[in-house]
Structures are given as structure tokens and as C-alpha cells.
Amino acid sequence: MKTYTKNPINPRDTRTFKGKDGKKEKEKFAVVPIPNTIETYVVSNYGRIFNVDKAYELEKRPLRKEDPKYLVTRINTRTDDNKVNCGSYAVNVLVANTFVKKSKRDVALNRVIVHPIDWDASNSRYCNLQWVNRTELSILKDIRDGKTEEKDYVRYVCLLLQLGYLNDDIKAIINLPMKAKVKFINDIRKRSIYPYICAKYKY
């Protein structure tokens, strides 16, 4: 994959932003991982996309009116029978596929959904994106919607243990509010707390 350390269209327009852990990072660029593109398209870890051949930044627009922050962009590709296809591609997915490398555990747990950590789908910076699966996304939605009593967290952990999750897997997805996070998970694993909830799950 070809990469650039500066904006390939206008090197002066290479941005600096807060990356992981709040540290300043310079924008990086790479050719989009889409086969059979007609022109050369480049995506940045800041969430910008450019057509290098025609020297312009691609417009990002909402996929649906009811979800104005979920942004897509249009990229031209060529089909097997040599026809032009103008397809819509989610900006977050392009950034994640390029700059958020999946770990072995991501693959093992079938994490194929790109989730914006701050729930702002228009924030396409790579450091705001994580790979999740449907079960994890459902749990994260429940937490966002206020289901945050201790017994709720017990249910979340029980469900993930039932699916074969390791302690580190659980901590990576759920920001458990208690200080003794590992002890909390292990107590649930041993069914020594909230036994009436734990009894509903097989692990």
C-alpha cells in the first residue's frame, strides 16, 4: 500500500491533530484499499479523502437524512466488464480499513463493524474508531442509554463470558466503572456475586 507523509495534492495542507492519548500527530495518507479504482484515491488518518489524479478533496455527505453524521463518499471503480461504477463508501470504514489494524482477537471475535468511540459518526479520525461485533455494539448502546447499574454490568460480563471472552477482551470493550475490574470479572466467572443473574448464563 502506497503511503504519503504529506498531503499529495497540497503538502502545505497537512494537518496536525490530537491522536491517541491526546498526543499531537501529523496527518498521514495512504491509497484507499479498494480494488479497480479508475483514479488514484487517497485517505488520511484524519478522515479526509482525495482524488490525486484530479487534485481535489472528495465531498462527504450523509448516507441518510435521519442519520446526518454517518458520512459516505463516492468513488469510481471499473467493473469486470469494463463499465464504470460510482459507489458509495463509508468514510469511517475507509479510514479504519487503512489505519486501524485488526488484531488477532478482533478477527477471532468477528469484529467487522466500525464504531466511533465518541458516538459521533462524523468524527472519522482513526483514533476515534474501533472494531466491534454486533453483541459488543448492543452492549455499548445499552451503556450509552443509561443502563449502568452494577447488575447491568454483571449481565454484560456474563454474556461475554458465555461467548468465550477473556478478561482482557471484556476490559477492552466495556469501561467497567469499578476499580477492581479483574476481581469483578473473576467474581462473576466464579458466580460468587449476583448468582441469580449468573445462573442464567452458561460459561
Residue ranges and their predicted role:
Residues 2-113, 120-169, 174-179, 183, ...:
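Conserved recognition-core residues within compact binding domains
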